[in-house]
């Protein structure tokens, strides 16, 4: 075994199984690319991204940890979001929540 190595069972593994998800259409209205990481509170992403922000409160991208989604200028795409887990308390990011959801 290598230090830090994770050994898993054979077969496919479902990410975020049993967690609430939503699908949103997101458009980059800015003139620069915007990249959003896997665990960023989607409600607080760059203001150049246009979408139903209130629906995204308490959600993050439903992608593998350590990955990201890039929105090119003028691009519109559909993304799946997954509910934040744990205590559902958010601090930092753009400072729009700073407490319980």
Curated annotation (Swiss-Prot):
Chief location: cytoplasm
SUPFAM superfamilies for this protein: Urease, beta-subunit
Subcellular location: Cytoplasm
Enzyme type, top EC level: hydrolase
Keyword Ion transport: no
Transmembrane segments: none
EC number(s) given by UniProt: 3.5.1.5
Coiled-coil boundaries: none
Pathway recorded for this protein: Nitrogen metabolism; urea degradation; CO(2) and NH(3) from urea (urease route): step 1/1
CDD domains the record matches: Urease_beta (cd00407)
Annotated signal peptide: none
Molecular function terms, GO-annotated: urease activity
Catalytic activity annotation: urea + 2 H2O + H(+) = hydrogencarbonate + 2 NH4(+)
Entry GO CC: urease complex
GO annotation terms (biological process): urea catabolic process
UniProt keyword list: Cytoplasm, Hydrolase
InterPro entries in the cross-refs: Urease_beta-like, Urease_betasu_sf, Urease_subunit
Entry similarity comment: Belongs to the urease beta subunit family.
Description of how the protein assembles with itself and partners: Heterotrimer of UreA (gamma), UreB (beta) and UreC (alpha) subunits. Three heterotrimers associate to form the active enzyme.
PANTHER family on file: UREASE (PTHR33569:SF1)
The protein, known as: Urease subunit beta
């Amino acid at each position: 075994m290598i230090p830090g190595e994770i050994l898993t069972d054979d077969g496919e593994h479902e990410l975020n199984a049993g967690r609430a998800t939503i699908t949103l259409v997101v458009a980059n209205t800015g003139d620069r690319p915007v990249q959003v990481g896997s665990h960023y509170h989607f409600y607080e992403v760059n203001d150049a991204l246009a979408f139903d922000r209130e629906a995204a409160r308490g959600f993050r991208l439903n992608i593998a940890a350590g990955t990201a989604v890039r929105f090119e200028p003028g691009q519109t795409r559909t993304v799946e979001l997954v509910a934040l887990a744990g205590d559902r308390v958010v601090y930092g990011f753009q400072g729009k929540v700073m407490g319980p959801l």
